[in-house]
Swiss-Prot record:
It is an enzyme of class 2 (transferase). Residues 1-30, 225-254 are annotated as: Disordered. It catalyses: 2'-phospho-[ligated tRNA] + NAD(+) = mature tRNA + ADP-alpha-D-ribose 1'',2''-cyclic phosphate + nicotinamide. GO terms for biological process: tRNA splicing, via endonucleolytic cleavage and ligation. Residues 233-244 have a biased composition (Basic and acidic residues). It holds the Pfam family PTS_2-RNA. This is tRNA 2'-phosphotransferase 1. Catalyzes the last step of tRNA splicing, the transfer of the splice junction 2'-phosphate from ligated tRNA to NAD to produce ADP-ribose 1''-2'' cyclic phosphate. The gene is TRPT1. One of its GO terms (molecular function) is tRNA 2'-phosphotransferase activity. Belongs to the KptA/TPT1 family.
Amino acid sequence: MNSFGGRRRETAGPKGRRAHRPPQDQDRDVQLSKALSYALRHGALKLGLPMGADGFVPLDALLQLPQFRSFSAEDVQRVVDTNVKQRFALQPGDPSTGPLIRANQGHSLQVPELELEPLETPQALPLMLVHGTFRQHWPSILLKGLSCRGRTHIHLAPGLPGDPGVISGMRPNCEVAVFINGPLALADGIPFFRSTNGVILTPGNADGVLPPKYFKEALQLRPTRKPLSLAGNEEKEHQRDSKHSSRGRGMTQQ
């Protein structure tokens, strides 16, 4: 059933579906997907879109914006249906609003009634919680932890790209996977949620950070897979403490 005429749904289309479409159409779909991501995750207020507490905005209002005027409702429907990461959801709405669309997660805007399933016990958490990043960010993450970085949540996947059942949560070209000790973080009061497309979300601590104490292990994914040490943070702290201690002794001797 078409999402405009039935209950809300968010499904990924067949993986081979796009391969049979002309390259220029695929490029337009990528352009539309990126524009939707910005408007629905970050820019709705700036663009003047009326967003509900659940993150939905009227599709008709969206399509009136200059960057969307070359696209139709059918284009949006196709991008929603064929998006393998299930980033967006459509629902019929009512006669006053018409069809509604939202991003399933990834907001920097506050969306207080986004449909998230609380994961309140260790048993409710996936067996694997992993955050994907790039090698250039790893030293900072190892030292300071994972940060929301302007979004409302830190994104985690229930597995590595290509694992069965893993739809979204990390980019397929990530170079480093950071595995999280969810039960330990949960015991310390850090909440976790599951979005409608299976991404695990956490706001982190009061500072919006998931500290390194919750890292179980780290894995370099490319160019070859190999374990990464978690000792770097402890070594740096030890070196810093030793430097301060030596400096203090030198001042005392003077």
